Amino acid sequence: MRKGIWQEFDGYQDVVAEIKVSRKLGGTASAAVIAAEEYIRKLHPARLALGVADIIEETASSKTLRLVSKDNYLPPFLAGQYIALFLEIGGIRTSRPYSISSQPNQVGYYDITIRRVENGLVSNYLLNEVKRGDSLSSSGPAGNFYFNPLIHKKKMVCIAGGSGITPFMSMIREIIECGLDRSVYLFYGSKTTDDVIFGNEIARLAQRFANIHYIPVIEEPAESYAGACGFITRNVLQKVLENIEDKSFFICGPQGLYDFCLPQVQDLGVPRRKIRQEMYGAPPNIHEYPGWPADIKPDDTFSVNVKNRKPIKAKAAESLLSALEKNEILVPSLCRSGECSMCRVKILSGKVYQPAGVPVRKSDRQFGYVHSCMAFPISDLEILL
């Protein structure tokens, strides 16, 4: 190669000038930059090394794992946020988000509460296999489902279903322990009284503190049950809430709860933009949702050609993210409910079904990106990770 040929490349002099500037500034700024980066990494770590300090049985189908740091530090969090556990189960590397149910004013541990899901890969593993002293890996705290004093009213209407109670438990505990000037109206839907998580604790707090209002709603009550029955309907809400103008609304639970309760809340006159939501995973019966192609059966199998990798098979009723994980193709993910956008992939050819309400950015729609956790193959696909 001819000596000095690189000097003839376009932009060579600009690169040389940039290097000189970087060397000049780098020496004086490096210490401050390094310190700032270390502090940021401490507050927002990519991974946390955690140990299981205790396991608390909440109901016959749910337990709380008390997690402590193996590095003697846990990042702060806001009541309502979650961590994602990174796991390998049966050779499948996957992740699951779990809301932190402990209060944020203590920094010694994170409590996460797991409810058993029928045929659930992760929930059954955590409930059946994990023991005190075991090690787990997680993300740092994440999520936008929290109280913001700049935009939210001091009176909170919280609608929960199943394990969707966990972020509200963190909020309630913080309000009580820190003496915050907020009120909570908690409507908690469960199939039976035996399925209610934290029921005794919430009932005690509601009896003791005037700013905590607890309304359990039981779908299949026992004969002796005297509370609200059925589902969390507009009528159930109206019986408790005098008006809506001075309240903020939060919904957390499975997709079915959100699909049912959102119209009930809107019927009260609450604008959609004033209702915060936190969904737990993809719908279990996605083929029953509006817009699902009538000619596609849940067990229909399609070929997914992952660019620069071998093709895989994916069932229509299984999210693209789950199919990739089962075939040992790891895709970054946190929320698994279509909100964080970390698992986005580009559809090069083929079609996927996405349920209404998934917050896909306009630019992603324009260039063919989807959230793989909430995208279901309805034809053969070619994708780019």
Q: What residues fall within each predicted segment?
A:
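Ferredoxin-reductase
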Residues: I34-S135, S139, K153-K154, S190-T192, ...
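Phosphate-handling active-site elements
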Residues: E177-Y185, G350-P359
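C-terminal accessory/binding modules appended to enzymatic or scaffolding proteins
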Residues: P298-P332, R336-E339, L348
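FNR/FR-type flavoprotein reductase catalytic core
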Residues: M1-Q7, G11-D14, N124-N305
